Amino acid sequence: MVRALGDGLLQDGEEERRIKLPPHSVEAEQSLLGGLMLDKSAWDKIADVVGSEDFYRKDHKLIFRAIAELIEDGQPCDVVMLSEFLDKRDELESAGGLEYLATLANETPGSANARAYANIVRERAMLRLSLIHISEPTRPF
């Protein structure tokens, strides 16, 4: 999959920096989104597992919300429809652009593992939430 800026990779082949990031799986997010673009029926497998708030990356949240709205409206959610939908809302560039959407669809092997990817995305979201609660100072009653 395409790695985005800010994912810990430096330019020009330098070593990857070890930055402490909250738990997430960009690969699971990308595979889930790509699978949904390839197979609209995969929505039924994942709708009860994951929501847009579970995605770590903002662009993935936007893409997931757009897919959800298209599916709820009975529309196809392939690359063309998704890019048109996001463009009309002036969110296409924030979602990574047409090229990123095409990459998601083209580099995803299919939708067979959509529920497994959704479970990973949800699990990492729950871990992030737990870390937030653990790191908050306790307040006396």
Write out the residue ranges for each language-model feature.
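Noncatalytic partner-interaction/assembly domains of nucleic-acid and motor enzyme complexes
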Residues: 1-126
